[in-house]
Regions:
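N-terminal Rossmann-like NAD(P) cofactor-binding module of classical short-chain dehydrogenase/reductase
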Residues: 74-77
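Aromatic pocket-lining residues of Rossmann-like dinucleotide-binding sites
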Residues: 23
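Conserved N-terminal Rossmann-fold NAD(P) cofactor-binding segment
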Residues: 31, 35-72
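Conserved NAD(P)H cofactor-binding loop of Rossmann-fold oxidoreductase domains
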Residues: 80-82
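N-terminal Rossmann-fold NAD(P) dinucleotide-binding loop
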Residues: 16-17
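Glycine-rich Rossmann-fold phosphate-binding loop(s) that bind the pyrophosphate
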Residues: 12-13
Length: 82
């Protein structure tokens, strides 16, 4: 695994949240950034997932962000609905 690997997930609904959880539990990245137009959902999903992975041996940093975070992202997942 590359160090400091950032994954940005656009869309904090069911698909984006489950994708973030799977990535967290498989120790694939160091940081997961949620982006969603519903800022309350974005924040609550990030907080819930951060609580879920808190006791993992190497839990990623989970936070909310904006589209500038996509610039240095290693992977961008688009899970936003149409």
């Amino acid at each position: 695994m590359l160090s400091n690997r950032r994954i940005v997930i656009i869309g904090a609904g069911h698909v984006g949240t489950h994708c973030a959880a799977a990535l967290s539990f498989q120790n694939i990245c160091d940081e997961i950034v949620f982006i969603d137009r519903d800022k309350e959902k974005e924040k609550s999903q990030a907080m819930d997932l951060a609580d879920s992975v808190a006791f993992l041996q190497s839990a990623p940093v989970i936070r909310v962000g904006d589209y500038k975070d996509c610039e240095d992202a290693d992977i961008i997942v688009i899970a936003a609905g149409v």
